[in-house]
Amino acid sequence: MSHFSTVKTKIKHKPQLIEALELLQYDVQENKELINPLDHQHEKVKVDVSIGDDIGFRLNQEGVYELVADIQTWKDPVPPARFLDKVTQQYARM
């Protein structure tokens, strides 16, 4: 069964996160629900920043953004770990 996973980041600032994603040529949307089409219960997760229907970032209780995605159905051509590295590097340049 497929489900959303979360990965902690060190990203704390939403405007810089959005700018980093846009500089990496991603189409950014804010305040969206991710929907897992392969989950029979149609799991939904609210995220603050998304770059598609199944990849996003949400602010956790510690004030840090975490990557939210279904790793099993990852569609981006860049693998998840490399994607997060690229976003983090671009964010650090802000």
What residues fall within each predicted segment?
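Interaction-mediating elements
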Residues: 1-94
